[in-house]
Amino acid sequence: MSQPTYDARAIVLRKTKLGESDLILTLLAEDGSQMRAVAKGARKPASSFAARLELYSVVDLLVARGRSLDIVKEARLESNERLRRDIEHAAGAAPMAELLDRVTQMGLENPRLFALTRTALSSLGRVDPAQVPAVCAAHLLKTLAFAGLRPSLDACVSCGR
């Protein structure tokens, strides 16, 4: 009997090795919640998944419900060429993904996080390398605010002025 499937749009935040040929994907779903799924065979040299599950990319997925983790059956990539080929731009996306991995939770929806991150990653693909830190910092501050963790920047921590 086949497993029930569903469509999901998500951003790939992290890839973790599982066994010899599989990957566990940590994703930011379109509803802003965290999602984890297995991409079977994604680490094999001839895998079609390898090129379609790039870090910091928006992907359209067909996912089957699994016992503990869902299973990616199909993936379609919205490529961000500059993030893939330029180390400065990819380095700007890394702290964004790390923070999102820490502030998002499975089942806790925050759709503004997906929209913000998609826009920031798209911006990273268009800006000069000198502007990458500004885009990254803006995303980090907005993410903290959307997660209810906005730092107070209008007064000195030491003296309160």
What residue spans do the PLM features occupy?
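Non-catalytic alpha-helical scaffolds and adjoining flexible linkers that form interface surfaces
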Residues: 1-161
